């Protein structure tokens, strides 16, 4: 089994565990934890750090609150990872807002505008 394959499998397992932990979260929060999505996880080579990219259904302020919620409860989530995945040491979790969806929408809008401009140029010529 190659190291890259193992890393990908661990990232996938961590994502599953965190999603389950979000679903079972019982604490107080300003946001609805069931609307938080774990989009992707990037595990460091030494498996000591996990960058977790989070998305939330809501406006920008609510998205920031979702990341803050995850940061405030990182001990709960790290414990869930430690209990469910056999690792020598559970990775330190670092939560980030995922901007992939917004970026792809912005790029598609720009491409549509370019296409319209090219069509207008062709019509004018």
From Swiss-Prot:
Matches recorded under PROSITE patterns: RBFA
Similarity remark: Belongs to the RbfA family.
GO biological process, one term: maturation of SSU-rRNA
Protein name: Ribosome-binding factor A
Subunit structure: Monomer. Binds 30S ribosomal subunits, but not 50S ribosomal subunits or 70S ribosomes.
Places the protein is found: Cytoplasm
Keyword Membrane: no
Gene source species: Kosmotoga olearia (strain ATCC BAA-1733 / DSM 21960 / TBF 19.5.1)
InterPro entries: KH_dom-like_a/b, RbfA, RbfA_dom_sf, Ribosome-bd_factorA_CS
One Pfam family cited in the UniProt record for this chain: RBFA
Alphabetical UniProt keywords: Cytoplasm, Ribosome biogenesis
GO cellular-component term (any): cytosol
Gene name tied to this protein: rbfA
Function: One of several proteins that assist in the late maturation steps of the functional core of the 30S ribosomal subunit. Associates with free 30S ribosomal subunits (but not with 30S subunits that are part of 70S ribosomes or polysomes). Required for efficient processing of 16S rRNA. May interact with the 5'-terminal helix region of 16S rRNA.
Record-level Gene Ontology MF annotations: ribosomal small subunit binding
């Amino acid at each position: 089994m190659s190291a890259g394959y193992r890393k990908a499998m661990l990232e996938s397992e961590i994502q599953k565990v965190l999603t389950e932990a979000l679903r079972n979260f019982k604490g107080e929060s300003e946001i609805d934890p069931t609307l938080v999505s774990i989009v992707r996880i990037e595990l460091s080579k030494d498996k000591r750090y996990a960058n977790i990219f989070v998305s939330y259904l809501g406006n920008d302020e609510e998205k920031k609150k979702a990341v803050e919620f995850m940061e405030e409860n990182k001990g709960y989530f790290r414990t869930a990872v430690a209990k469910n995945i056999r690792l020598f040491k559970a990775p330190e979790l670092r939560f980030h807002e995922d901007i992939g969806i917004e970026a792809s929408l912005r790029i598609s809008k720009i491409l549509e505008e370019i296409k319209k401009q090219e069509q207008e140029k062709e019509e004018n010529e």
